[in-house]
């Protein structure tokens, strides 16, 4: 079984070592890995200005990915509320970024500053991976990341977006929101919006099988295209990167998906093709 991991973080200030990652991937049957760039300018970065920091981390992202033959895929982590967010998005796209990562740490997804940035990204044909669910940091920001806050995507034409971690602990809310977007294709408001669910852990082991059972249940009851809108991810980091973990998680997730009722072929597509 080939593996496509859509959720691996680049450690801050890390020296790009794509060869190390590719060697580990080859050893464990991992075909492709999405690398998420270092974080935006939330705090001071060694005396750099925000623009200097953002340019530097974009350059490192491309150093991690440019020589990988398409196996390490660059996704740029952007704060859509920053004044120059659209300029950042354009620089990232010009450099070769395939999409964007957003964490709503201090703002709601539908913030007026962010919405034009989402539309700009959608117009460029790029997708957005959002953190969703409880955020394990020291901020009071859980309510920013509840799935129903992404109803704002109804107002973004052509957007493709994913909610990560099955939005744990709000997995049912995430799945319900998917159902709403699935049904939206029959609405006059439908303008090509597509929602995906990133199954990257965040869901503790006890809940993970339950979440997959719920996903299959609603799929079997008519949530359209759900089998093609689930993504596999490991939430790994480049610093201690070991594709054994990716492969082990992929095998366990495949087993859970099949236990829930998905066919072996569908489980394989979720792990390697979606």
Model-predicted regions and their roles:
Residues 47-144, 196, 201:
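Active-site gating/metal-coordination segments in enzymes
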């Amino acid at each position: 079984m080939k593996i496509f991991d859509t959720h691996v973080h680049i450690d801050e200030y890390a020296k790009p070592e794509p060869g190390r990652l590719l060697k580990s991937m080859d050893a464990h049957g991992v075909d492709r890995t999405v690398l998420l760039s270092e974080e935006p300018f939330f705090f001071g970065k060694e005396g750099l200005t925000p623009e200097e920091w953002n340019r530097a981390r974009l350059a490192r992202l491309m150093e991690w990915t440019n020589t990988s033959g398409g196996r390490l895929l660059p996704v740029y982590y952007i704060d859509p509320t920053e004044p120059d967010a659209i300029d950042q998005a354009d620089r990232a796209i010009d450099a070769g970024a395939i999409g964007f990562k957003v964490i709503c740490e201090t703002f709601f997804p539908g913030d007026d500053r962010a919405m034009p940035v989402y539309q700009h990204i959608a117009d460029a044909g790029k997708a957005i991976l959002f953190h969703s669910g409880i955020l394990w940091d020291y901020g009071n920001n859980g309510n920013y990341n509840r799935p129903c806050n992404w109803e704002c995507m109804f107002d973004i034409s052509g957007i493709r977006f994913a909610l990560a971690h099955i939005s744990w602990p709000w997995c049912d809310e995430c799945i319900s929101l998917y159902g709403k977007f699935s049904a939206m294709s029959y609405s006059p408001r439908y303008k090509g919006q597509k929602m995906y669910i990133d199954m990257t852990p965040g869901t503790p082991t006890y809940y993970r099988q339950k979440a997959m059972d719920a996903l299959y249940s609603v799929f079997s009851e008519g949530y359209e295209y759900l089998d093609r809108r689930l993504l596999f991810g490991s939430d790994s980091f480049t610093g201690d990167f070991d594709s054994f973990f990716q492969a082990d998680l992929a095998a366990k997730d495949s087993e859970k998906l099949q236990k829930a009722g998905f066919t072996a072929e569908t489980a394989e597509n979720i792990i390697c093709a979606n």
